[in-house]
Structure formats: C-alpha cells, structure tokens
Amino acid sequence: MKTFTAKPETVKREWFVVDAAGQTLGRLATEIASRLRGKHKPEYTPHVDTGDYIVVINAEQVRVTGAKSSDKMYYSHSGFPGGIKEINFEKLIAKAPERVIETAVKGMLPKNPLGRDMYRKLKVYAGAAHPHTAQQPQELKI
C-alpha cells in the first residue's frame, strides 16, 4: 500500500467562523493555527496547504490570564536606529483588536512561503459582523 500524499489541486477547503468572545488568547490561537495548517484532517501533508479558512469574530472580547493584560508587550521596529516601538496588550486591544489574534496565530505557523499562504486564510474582525456570509461558514466551537 502506498503512502497517500495530498495534491494542492484536490484539497477541499471549508469555511469556519469562530467566536472569540471570552476565549483565552493562547488556547484559541493554537486551535486556529492547527486548523489553518490542516492537521485536523486525515489527508494532512506537511508540504501541502491542506487547511481551512477561519473567520474570527469578536476579537475585541478575547482575554488573557493573570497580569498579562498590562504586562504583555508587543514590539515592532521601523528599521531605523532607535526605531523600536512597544505597546502593551490593553492598549493594542483598544487600538487594533484584530492584531492581537493575528500576531498570536502568525507566530504558530511555519516561517516560510507555505506558512504565509496559510496565514492568508485567516480573517479576523473586531465585532460580530463579517463580510463572508456568501461562503456559508460553519460555526466552530473551541
């Protein structure tokens, strides 16, 4: 019996919607990253993008445990000397709530072209409304 290998043109992708309200950031991000990679499918192949599309709603209501809301820092750099910027979780969730989930999930995906393709299948929205109703996403309980 030969080992099955998924082909990119035969992969069937589904759409799922995840409600992040009241969810813990890390636990939510690990499940999303796993589904973006396709590891929940029996036909998972490491060198082929077999994952599904994930739509995350209510990103502004995601939570972290302990004192991380004030202690967890997000860093960015402009590329110029002295160009490092930092912002904590509380301020970032008020300024751009989508970036919190996007950053957490992106760090859990492969750092190569395949990982960037997987990341493009993640759609995050601050509120409950999203423009992907035409794809008829199924609700995913995490």
UniProtKB/Swiss-Prot annotation:
Keywords of this entry: Ribonucleoprotein, Ribosomal protein
SUPFAM superfamilies to which the protein is assigned, alphabetical: Ribosomal protein L13
Disulfide bond positions: none
GO molecular function: mRNA binding; structural constituent of ribosome
Protein's UniProt keywords contain Ribosomal protein: yes
InterPro entries registered for this protein in UniProt: Ribosomal_uL13, Ribosomal_uL13_bac-type, Ribosomal_uL13_CS, Ribosomal_uL13_sf
Annotated GO CC locations: cytosolic large ribosomal subunit
GO biological process, one term: negative regulation of translation
Protein function: This protein is one of the early assembly proteins of the 50S ribosomal subunit, although it is not seen to bind rRNA by itself. It is important during the early stages of 50S assembly.
Family: Belongs to the universal ribosomal protein uL13 family.
Description of how the protein assembles with itself and partners: Part of the 50S ribosomal subunit.
Protein name according to UniProt: Large ribosomal subunit protein uL13
Species annotation: Pseudomonas entomophila (strain L48)
Gene: rplM
